[in-house]
């Protein structure tokens, strides 16, 4: 096994895909073939070890990311299995933030699906090198070559084919290894544990030679020695070819494509070989950038070294009924032992580490030490939340925080028993600590508790967890759309807050420029005060006031997004000014701005993909139009049509029932949040009435 200090023999990878592409099934085979577990857990039987939550086993889907560690070819592989459903995309986001590489699993029949695109873009965001595994090659309709084309066309990637399938559908028996130019077939009675190398079938030899020539031509561009040898007509050895492929993967020049059928126990061992051979180790990504905790403008370079100061990022928090709060971290440099004290530089507090745990889904193994490249869980931390940096107290550095998506749906919840009100508050506070995409607030008018999340399934799971894990049964209101507001024009506001009450009064003057920002920008605050017009101790009051008041809206009480507020001038009074006075002045400036900056209402727009038999296409498109939807694309999908449309979320309630009705149950759909758009003038009144 790899030595603890050898970073080159470590891989931190994620398994990512669209729902039902076979991520967890692939992970279960990996754990079986690496000897991590002695039996294969099947998703459809509710026995997958990585799907440990009751809801996951009942529904056959992954809801929360699960971590484990296994060994292959003297290499330690830390694996995070992520969800494929769009409602739990936050789990993919925070996992990719701390991983060095990823395996993207595709359904060999469906190819690149909507959530495949979403997770691919998330991996692009964090520059995560990846390899592709075209799964389910045993299924009727599986088309490896069409899937490769979709990886190129829909993902904008450069696929580098390393394998070809031997056989199609039920006759799929193995793969052609283009690197070694041999066949690999699996013995079914061994559950795929035994496999054989052999000659390439004669009917595939010409195609294999063609694809290998393409492989070599692309790969040698990564290495001058290999390129010169290739141009001189020399033979490219297998070790040199692998080295070229590895360089190209780490440099994001291309993505290797392999194939198999995890459920039929074919193709997983070569996938593991590819993880070790081609995906980067922590030492291949030698430095990361952070900022000084005392001076955020000062960049700090952190080396991926066991010998440097300890730096780690907390990427997940979960509550374990036996251990309490567990904080999952990725260590970027240095070492950490149990019973240590570390600095949470994001919050400016120290934390005492109780136990260090290596996780296998929800099973725990105590370990004495972790070091650069490790992923583990810490017990005993009290104040650390997702995205916080943990570091040596003598090296206060802050890593880039994580961005979390806006919620698109909300529900009102009340405990069935009034005696459970306090228990519900405790339950929700713990669930929010675990899930940064879940927001909880109280409606100031009705007093109702409002849950805001990523979709109906997300919120349904939260309510179910309250009941199962905390014993709180809640009555739930109908789902509501999470509308937003924004501004369309710039406005410069001068506002004076002045109040005299006999004793010390209140005085604050602010000059703020409000400007619209591009969609998805959120809220930005900039301080441009010079010459002490407003003392620096009052500036946080201005920002706090704007942060609070923007949540109350301008038109219909919905949060305001995608705007910038620049504080450029103001005035204060030596006696009557205070942070509170400036907070109130900022709120007043915001309310005055609402009349001048062209406020508009925004609604979440969903990307909806509908697969329907040809004979129902007209009805389906007509229905899309009736929902204020826009058809963006239509494609042939075997004997059906794939319709891609953009439809307001508010028009999608009850759609599953309507689609079944108009297609006699033969059509299906999936939807994903795309963006916020302005509500048309003729629809604003209907939204306001809600």
Curated annotation (Swiss-Prot):
Belongs to the TRAFAC class translation factor GTPase superfamily. Classic translation factor GTPase family. EF-G/EF-2 subfamily. GO terms for molecular function: GTP binding; GTPase activity; translation elongation factor activity. The keyword Cell membrane does not apply. Keywords: Cytoplasm, Elongation factor, GTP-binding, Nucleotide-binding, Protein biosynthesis. Residues 8-283 form the tr-type G domain. This is Elongation factor G. It comes from Anaplasma marginale (strain St. Maries). It is found in: Cytoplasm. Gene3D superfamilies: 3.30.230.10, 3.30.70.240, Elongation Factor G (Translational Gtpase), domain 3, P-loop containing nucleotide triphosphate hydrolases, Translation factors. The keyword Chloroplast does not apply. Its main location: cytoplasm. GO terms for biological process: ribosome disassembly. GTP binds at residues 17-24, 81-85, 135-138. Catalyzes the GTP-dependent ribosomal translocation step during translation elongation. During this step, the ribosome changes from the pre-translocational (PRE) to the post-translocational (POST) state as the newly formed A-site-bound peptidyl-tRNA and P-site-bound deacylated tRNA move to the P and E sites, respectively. Catalyzes the coordinated movement of the two tRNA molecules, the mRNA and conformational changes in the ribosome.
